[in-house]
Amino acid sequence: MTPDQNALVLSFLLTVGGLIGYLRKKSKVSLIAGTALGANFAWASKLMERGSSQGINYAFYGSLVLLASSGPRFYKSRKPVPMILTVLGVISTWYFYRLWA
């Protein structure tokens, strides 16, 4: 998969995850964070598709935000959803850092 496709997959997963969090638990934070990060990764994907190096920047910093927000939640709660988000954050940060650096 190309970097823009990876960013698009993350966009989809985060947006759907935020929507599910809202529908199941009425969590407005999940909805806002999921759609905001999802939009960030969608925009990053579009920029990468157009050949702009700014897309990598958006994806890398979005990955850092995902990791920084989910890591402490997983450390504190040890629940599966924060764990999955943390793993996604670690992998995506590593992946986009390699492209960014």
Swiss-Prot record:
Membrane topology: Multi-pass membrane protein
Pfam families tied to this protein: Tmemb_14 (PF03647)
Keyword tags: Endoplasmic reticulum, Membrane, Transmembrane, Transmembrane helix
Location relative to the cell: Endoplasmic reticulum; Membrane
Tree of life domain: Eukaryota
Record's keyword annotation contains Methyltransferase: no
Bilayer-crossing regions: 7-24, 81-100
One of the GO biological process terms: mitochondrial transmembrane transport
One cellular-component annotation, GO: endoplasmic reticulum
Similarity field: Belongs to the TMEM14 family.
Name used for this protein in its record: TMEM14 protein homolog P14E8.05c
